[in-house]
Regions:
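Extracytoplasmic
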Residues: 10, 19-42, 53-85, 90-131
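Intrinsically disordered, low-complexity, repeat-rich polar/charged segments
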Residues: 1-8
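Active-site-flanking beta-strand signature of metal-NTP-handling nucleotidyl enzymes
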Residues: 44-49
């Protein structure tokens, strides 16, 4: 009985992660949403660019970018507060992500990019319901 309940809970958790709602505002801008990040292979990396506390500011940042398809936005919790994270690209290896981080387009702005494992991003995404 307990095993069946644990199996149901595990299935529900996987389903919730797989069925994250897409972020229509982000997709309308031509960028990627949390569901795209969740669909990427666990061994990969993305480049975290910037974190905003206001959704409108995060969307405005994406709007300013030329090639929005390279950008993704997701919501997570940081120190108990909702924040909006902008990341750039998906890379199969850390070395590929490091090389891309060193060559970011000028419109990204003066930032300190963080090469972040996709597994870590997926954990952050699962901490809060996406819009």
């Amino acid at each position: 009985m307990a095993s069946e309940e644990a199996d149901r809970e595990a299935q529900a958790a996987r389903a919730n992660l797989a069925d994250l709602p897409t972020d229509a505002d982000v997709q309308e801008l031509g960028a990627r949403s949390a569901s795209w990040l969740v669909a990427q292979a666990d061994g990969g990396y993305t480049i975290q660019l910037i974190v905003y506390t206001e959704r409108s500011a995060a969307l405005a940042y994406v709007r300013r970018q030329k090639n929005r398809r390279d950008f993704a936005m997701f919501k997570t919790l940081s120190q108990g507060r909702t924040v909006y994270v902008i990341s750039y690209g998906y890379y199969a290896s850390q070395s590929a992500a490091d090389a891309a981080a060193a060559e970011l387009p000028a419109e990204v702005g003066r930032i300190e990019p963080w090469v972040r494992p996709i597994g870590s991003v997926k954990t952050a995404i699962s901490s809060i319901a996406q819009d």
